[in-house]
Amino acid sequence: MEIYDIIIIGGGPAGISAGIYAVSRGKNVVVIEKEKVGGLIGSVSTVTHYAGIMEGETGSTFAARLEKQEKNAGVSIVYETVQKVSLKGEYKTVVTDKGTYQAQKVILANGTTPRKLGIPGEDELVGRGIGRNAAGEGANFSGKHIYVVGGADGAVKEALYLAQFAE
């Protein structure tokens, strides 16, 4: 088993930034990401409140730029689901669904996940009437009534984006 200097849990903006910086300082790093580089921000219609964002940039283009920078920097990334973390001892251990990793340091950059409504049948209807990615799924709802459930400016921003498709 290879022992890393740093294990980073999460491939969103924070995790990728930490990985790029650590590699630039000569550290042996692995980023563990369960789905895709960019995390949740990769699914938003327009990215705001991040340094270096191009005006009107979508979440998917931002995530693609993160992935390109991560690859160009030589950051190692694996797509696995973390199941257990032990931070005891000199070497920390991270167990995933595909293997075990050890490092002197662990950075938690695990981000966020969309909140569920908690209504019966919600999980079964994702992709068949319930969407969680306005930028990627909005056109699928063209000419239909669209309801947005969420809080703060993020929900308003997505509702404004989806208005172009709604009845």
Give the predicted meaning of each segment.
Residues 39, 117, 157:
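Alpha-helical elements of the RecA-like P-loop NTPase motor core of helicases
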